[in-house]
Amino acid sequence: MITSVKKQGYDIIVVGGGIAGCCAALAAARENKSVLLVEKHINLGGLATIGLISWFEPLCDGEGRKMMGGMAEEMIRLAVGCGYDNLPEIWGGTSGNAQSSDRYSTHFSPTFFSLALDDILRKNGVTILYDALATYPKVDNNVIVGITVENIDGRLLYPCKAVIDCTGDAAVASRAGVPTRTYDNTQTYVVHDTNRRHAAEFVDSGNMTKLRHWQWFKPGAETIGEVTAAIENDYLRRSKQMTLAYYVGTDKNEREILTLPELPQIRLLRAIVGAETFLGRVEDIDKHVANSIGS
């Protein structure tokens, strides 16, 4: 029988080091809480970095008015602080490679953004535990009081006062018995590649987004329902086969895949059933949410 070794406790444990998890950990640390961030991969940023969706959605309304600030704006600044960008000049862009529109949005370097996330969390006192899988929460009287983690050291129990589930599929909440629901997903697969033509365009323009090119694939049906392990692995198998088939037969000395995604690029897996749900879909356009804290 494998027993759990009890480790140091924390005020807050954040499970999942995607953008949401990083923001949650940073916010908690700035409130002088002791924070442990548990991440199963070895780099931060989730879908935005190791998932290769390195595009920051607009923070404006399309008419020159900023609609979001706070940590969202802090993250877009962090994303372009050390790596390339194509942020418009009116929003502080300095690359000279802005998009044709003036939206407050940008492409960014997924690698530099991941490193920047690690840096800002450590500077704010967050303890990061990489290459660690949060398996099951410890629940006492319907309250999560700890997280069981498995890594190279074995099975560890980290006590806590509160847990923030940023796994992307409500893994902690679901295993604690919290009601959850699933959503339909569009199947896409993105890799970053380059070739001789892209390199020439970069040399001519100095625009790094010309060199790091997104290549999209559609490995299956338009939508899938609940994502199981079998469905996820089938999606990954088809995605990899489709990707390889696309490049086979092209000149191997003219092109290169720069990066493959290190996690499934699935947007909606499972979520906690909240008091209110707003997805921004067509059916939500006229929906009024009285307790919205956004714009």
Model-derived regions: residue spans:
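Beta1/beta-strand and adjacent pyrophosphate-binding region of the FAD-binding site
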Residues: 6-18
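N-terminal Rossmann-fold NAD(P) dinucleotide-binding loop
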Residues: 21
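Basic/polar N-terminal segments that are highly enriched at the extreme N-terminus
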Residues: 1-5
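Flavin (FAD/FMN)-binding glycine-rich loop and adjacent Rossmann-like elements that form
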Residues: 47-48, 71, 114, 131, ...
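Short, hydrophobic/aromatic-rich segments at coil-to-beta transitions
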Residues: 141-147
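Conserved N-terminal/central alpha/beta ligand/cofactor-binding core
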Residues: 27, 33-34, 39-136, 140, ...
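Loop/turn elements at helix/coil->beta-strand transitions in domains of secreted/extracellular proteins
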Residues: 9-11, 31-34, 124-127, 156, ...
